[in-house]
């Protein structure tokens, strides 16, 4: 009988079993080596988060297996303290089916998903929670409550989304932004998108040198492709201090950003080529396509987070497996704990 070829998307099971003192039963079949290699980067990130204070997190509309167990598993790793907001009878039903004891978690009843999103934002504004986690609802439904002008969570920064990605064929994790929030960002929007991603990368990267590749279809500046003009402007803005704490170069085509060989073959001399930490997409469509191509064709492991709001917002695709939701919670934990530490240092000076 032919063995089944699998991708073990519950790659945190063994670590969790050790943490809880339970028996680990590995999945049957042949493991996907590329996926496992990529997952090692995220396992390292999880281990680095061990010891950080868990953050109280409003989980919005967790009425399916993935959204509920994603929050529960993150709680088992002591990354978050979930506050489950949604129709209580539906939460209880999915908990019963998946053998989750809700006695350990606070549940706030909300009849509909939009009401759950509104309540989560209210808790964040009152500082009763330190993060928000998307459950089984549409992104625009959650983000409408977040960006609402009267009672939302806006700051002076443009809100943006970042995917943290890892693939076996690239030596380190990298960010793709923005692939979920800003559809056709202006130059000013892109400045904030880039700065948000830089700030995140500094929180999670042990080597503090951050390199940003601003992507377009070509590596030369031409008015025929307006995104090359934006890329060139962003690069110069970094030179002038309008974008801080990173080397920014663009326009760069994807191959030139990822492959030093491709850049050298085209005669491109860039400090970013082959060593990018952040890939800035021209628009949402191209960024979303790039991230999902890497996930489904390149066996990428990915986590998603919304930046620039008053609290980190854990935002993944509804099709994302449980462990990728856990790693997204880890990103929120890094943001919360390091921001809190920075504010403490500033207050003591």
UniProtKB/Swiss-Prot annotation:
| Entry's Gene Ontology cellular component terms | cytoplasm
Can you say where in the cell this protein is located? Cytoplasm
Give all cystine bridges in this chain.
none
Q: Key word Acyltransferase present in the record?
A: yes
Q: What is its EC number?
A: 2.3.1.8
Q: What is the recorded name of this protein?
A: Phosphate acetyltransferase
Task: Identify the enzyme class.
Answer: transferase
């Amino acid at each position: 009988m032919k063995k089944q070829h699998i991708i073990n998307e519950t790659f945190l099971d063994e670590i969790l079993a050790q943490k809880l003192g339970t028996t680990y039963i590995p999945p049957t079949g042949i493991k996907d080596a590329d996926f496992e290699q990529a997952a090692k980067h995220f396992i390292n990130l999880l281990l680095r988060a061990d010891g950080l204070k868990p953050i109280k997190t409003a989980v919005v509309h967790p009425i399916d297996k993935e959204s509920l167990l994603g929050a529960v598993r993150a709680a088992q790793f002591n990354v978050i303290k979930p506050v489950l907001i949604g129709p209580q009878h539906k939460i209880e039903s999915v908990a019963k089916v998946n053998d989750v004891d809700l006695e350990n978690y606070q549940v706030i009843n909300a009849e509909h998903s939009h009401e759950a999103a509104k309540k989560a934002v209210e808790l964040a504004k009152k500082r009763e929670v330190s993060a928000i986690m998307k459950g089984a609802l549409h992104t625009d439904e959650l983000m409408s409550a977040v960006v609402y002008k009267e009672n939302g969570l806006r700051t002076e920064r443009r809100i943006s989304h970042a995917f943290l990605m890892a693939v076996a064929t690239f030596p380190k994790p990298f960010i793709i932004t923005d692939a979920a929030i800003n559809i056709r960002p202006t130059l000013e929007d892109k400045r904030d998108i880039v700065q948000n991603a830089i700030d995140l990368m500094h929180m999670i990267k042990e080597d503090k040198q951050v390199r940003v590749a601003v992507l377009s279809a070509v590596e030369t500046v031409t008015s025929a492709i307006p995104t090359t003009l934006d890329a060139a402007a962003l690069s110069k803005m970094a030179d002038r201090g309008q974008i801080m704490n990173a080397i920014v170069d663009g326009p760069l085509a994807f191959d030139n950003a990822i492959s030093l060989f491709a850049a050298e073959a085209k005669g491109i001399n860039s400090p970013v080529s082959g060593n990018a930490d952040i890939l800035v997409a021209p628009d949402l469509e191209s960024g979303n396509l790039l991230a999902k191509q890497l996930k489904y064709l390149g066996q990428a492991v990915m986590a998603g987070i919304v930046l620039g709001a008053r609290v980190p917002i854990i935002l993944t695709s509804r099709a994302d497996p449980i462990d990728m939701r856990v790693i997204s919670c880890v990103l929120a934990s890094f943001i919360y704990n390091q921001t809190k530490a920075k504010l403490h240092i500033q207050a003591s000076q």
